């Protein structure tokens, strides 16, 4: 069958004789014209519109929700009656995972090149879901003899049909509103592109460019040849391929909503389901006739008789409606060998669903064309099923792909991850938002047991965030990210208990905002472990802060000098005693008291500091003092609103104190407004949940990456609101699995976080002993230590 090439008389003379006899693909398609940008008219005077939906991820969405959405879809079908038919098409198409590259020849750029190359080679697929609503033709009124009046009558009838169609489409869109339904348009190329994909298994934008061509001709852009049970697609703008088509021969006795979810194979595929309602009165008569027939022959298959009685009762009570159904599965491959491998998988999936699905031989051409909306005349195997069974078999299930760059504050996804269904997911820290407006919340939680790869994932995301030039600060624990920070061109230091820190807030916080913060912070510091200050003591602290800021001699901005400023407070020396704890030579003097100038630098694209000694300290006061001041320094740094990522390992240790409990929510809001993402890592959710501000924290971290833990218990995930499926993913996977559960504002997703495609770059990202064994223990003295491993 040819591609509808317009052939002139001279061309016919030099072409083979068989060309004259070859039928066109368009002649078998029903599409005539575009009524408007959304609506197509057919040869049979039917009208239809197509709705694209995002679907539900059946791997993670609770079964109750899947059943509820199935019931909603089935209910719409029942309510719209027998004047409307429905098709559901799932078309597999290859995903373009390219992203703007990380510029340069840095470690981050090498990681990006390696990862993007891997993602492109994986042949990952998305499966679009398109619901076609078909307005079946009404009985026409008598046509007047007058040409003018007949035209007016026909025009009004067409308009009435389109209005009814539009009402049902809007009704369905409202019912499926949580699936982001949108009507496909011809002007975008999507409407005709979808119809063409039913022929080819590949969806590309297609337009109706000339008025003298039918829509059928516009979407027929390949040559189709049927040989035995094979379908050969040749010519046109798409590569030549070979395909097969299957249809249901025997239906299952029962259906369930996930029965065909495994038909999401990574190949060019079209899965079509067609449902044409049967008038209830006619169906009741058919059921009654079948029951009478079975009674007449004294049928012993009582289960079947009972099923017929139940169907008759449910139909009479309006619980269900029946319709003619056909399901077809068309698959395409580059070679017949590849096609044979896919075919066996199709059969296995059908057997698992309790369905007998057969390949089509000489009938392949009829099933092939019957896939198209409004092409019922080509159907050869129709079954009578209920609207509920149709909603099961055509379930609107699909793994989401994440938010595109235009829908997130940083203008591009951070990276792509494969999913376990061989699709792909765009990872973004942020919730959906306009890049031109105030940033949405991008704070993220990474959960995983020790050794599960939390730090590696955080380092990978930090490297990929260089796509947007993000600045990165790392609050590290046990040097887990040291090698990654250094490889990424960053500075790394260590704060050790009892040793000089380089920190001195008295030197830095001298402007108006700084004085206000410093006063509040010092008062809390003085009260910690000692009780609340008296009003005159608080006033003395504020006065001393002001004097410190106004001092012309900068050498006076030390803790020893500050203690002398509050010594005159008429409180019997109580405030001075509290202050002296922090001066050199006293209990906490090592933290701030040994410094004159603050030389703790946060300059650079990557800055990491190991806080193991601080985090492991049993002294909550010292931990709070160090961390709160570093947070403050970063808070001042991010005022420039440059994209920034702050990574905090063992976050529950870092933030579990009264000071942060009172301020963490506002601090996270401030960070968000300053274009900053905070990534917190911990082993278990209950560690955060049990802290003084745990519930606030969990609510403030909308994105959550959870790595599997077979040894975890349900209580370890308290506060996250996980359903049974999500818990099974986290607690039931095999040891060593790199599957992760990702929760974001667009749902819950199962992604594959296996980064082994990075080769030795992954070992460097992970650091520790394995990293040192690869690059050498002296890597800290060699800024380019990672080079030479990028092509390994």
How does the language model describe each region?
Residues 454:
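Conserved lysine of the Walker
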Residues 1-403:
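Extended, folded cores of ATP/NTP-driven motor/assembly subunits in large transport
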């Amino acid at each position: 069958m040819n591609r509808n090439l317009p052939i002139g008389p001279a061309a016919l003379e030099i072409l083979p004789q068989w060309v004259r006899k070859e039928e066109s693909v368009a002649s078998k398609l029903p599409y005539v014209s575009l009524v408007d940008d959304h609506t197509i008219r057919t040869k049979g005077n039917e009208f239809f519109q197509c709705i694209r939906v995002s679907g539900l991820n059946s791997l993670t969405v609770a079964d109750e929700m899947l059943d509820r959405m199935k019931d909603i879809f089935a209910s719409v079908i029942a309510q719209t009656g027998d004047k409307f038919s429905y098709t559901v098409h799932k078309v597999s198409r290859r995903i373009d995972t390219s992203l703007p590259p990380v510029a340069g020849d840095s470690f981050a750029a090498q990681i990006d090149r390696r990862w993007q190359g891997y993602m492109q080679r994986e042949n990952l697929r998305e499966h679009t879901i398109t619901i076609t609503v078909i307005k079946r033709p009404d009985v026409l009124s008598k046509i007047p003899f007058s040409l003018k009046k007949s035209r007016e009558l026909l025009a009004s009838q067409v308009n009435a049909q389109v209005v009814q169609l539009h009402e049902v489409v809007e009704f369905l869109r409202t019912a499926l509103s949580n699936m982001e339904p949108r009507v496909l348009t011809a002007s975008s190329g999507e409407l005709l592109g979808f119809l063409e994909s039913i022929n080819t298994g590949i969806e590309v934008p297609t337009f109706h460019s000339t008025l003298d061509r039918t829509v059928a001709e516009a979407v027929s852009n390949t040559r189709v040849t049927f040989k035995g049970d094979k379908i050969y697609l040749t010519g046109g703008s798409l590569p030549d391929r070979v395909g097969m088509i299957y249809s249901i021969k025997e239906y299952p006795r029962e259906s369930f909503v996930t029965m065909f979810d495994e038909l999401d194979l990574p190949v060019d595929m079209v899965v079509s389901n067609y449902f044409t309602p049967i008038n209830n009165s006619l169906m009741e008569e058919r059921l009654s006739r079948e029951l009478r027939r079975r009674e007449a022959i004294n049928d012993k298959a009582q289960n079947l008789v009972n099923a017929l009685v139940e169907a008759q009762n449910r139909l009479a009570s309006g619980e269900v409606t029946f319709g003619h159904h056909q399901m077809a599965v068309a698959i395409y491959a580059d070679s017949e060998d590849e096609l044979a491998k896919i075919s066996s998988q199709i059969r296995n999936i059908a057997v698992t669903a309790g369905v007998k699905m057969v390949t089509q031989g000489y009938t392949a051409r009829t099933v092939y064309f019957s896939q198209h909306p409004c092409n019922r005349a080509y159907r050869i195997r129709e079954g009578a099923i209920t609207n509920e069974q149709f909603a099961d078999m055509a379930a609107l299930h699909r793994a989401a792909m994440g938010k595109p760059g235009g829908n997130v504050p940083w203008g591009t996804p951070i990276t792509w991850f494969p999913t376990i269904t061989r699709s792909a997911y765009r990872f973004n820290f942020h919730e959906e938002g306009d890049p031109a407006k105030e940033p949405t919340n991008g704070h993220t939680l990474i959960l995983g047991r020790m050794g599960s790869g939390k730090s590696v994932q955080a380092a990978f995301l930090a490297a990929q965030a260089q796509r947007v030039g993000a600045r990165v600060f790392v609050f590290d624990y046990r040097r887990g990210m040291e090698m990654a920070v250094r490889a990424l061109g960053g500075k790394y230091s260590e704060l050790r208990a009892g040793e000089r820190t380089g920190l001195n807030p008295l030197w830095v916080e001298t402007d108006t905002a700084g004085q206000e913060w410093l006063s509040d912070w010092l008062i809390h510091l003085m009260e910690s472990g000692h009780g609340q200050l008296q009003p005159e003591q608080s006033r003395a602290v504020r006065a001393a802060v002001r004097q410190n800021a106004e001092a012309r001699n900068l050498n006076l901005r030390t803790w020893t000098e500050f203690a002398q400023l509050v010594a005159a407070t008429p409180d019997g020396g109580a405030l001075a005693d509290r202050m002296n704890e922090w001066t050199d030579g006293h209990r906490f003097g090592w933290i701030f008291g040994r410094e004159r100038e603050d030389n703790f630098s946060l300059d650079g694209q990557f800055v990491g500091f190991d806080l193991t000694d601080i985090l492991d300290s049993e002294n909550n006061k010292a931990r709070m003092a160090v961390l709160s001041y570093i947070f403050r320094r970063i808070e001042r740094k991010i005022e420039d609103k440059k994209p920034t990522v702050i990574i905090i390992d063992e976050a529950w240790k870092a933030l579990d104190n009264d000071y942060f409990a009172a301020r963490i929510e506002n601090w996270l809001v401030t960070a968000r407004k300053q274009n900053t993402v905070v990534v917190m890592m911990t082993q278990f959710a209950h560690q955060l949940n049990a802290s003084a501000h745990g519930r606030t924290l969990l609510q403030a971290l909308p994105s959550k990456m959870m790595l599997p833990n077979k040894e975890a218990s349900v209580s370890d995930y308290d506060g996250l609101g996980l359903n049974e499926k999500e818990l099974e993913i986290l607690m039931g996977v095999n040891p060593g699995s790199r599957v992760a559960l990702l929760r974001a504002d667009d749902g819950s997703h199962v992604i594959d976080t296996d980064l082994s495609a990075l080769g030795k770059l992954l070992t460097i990202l992970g650091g520790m002993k394995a990293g040192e064994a690869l690059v050498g223990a002296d890597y800290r003295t060699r800024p380019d230590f990672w080079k030479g491993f990028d092509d390994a």
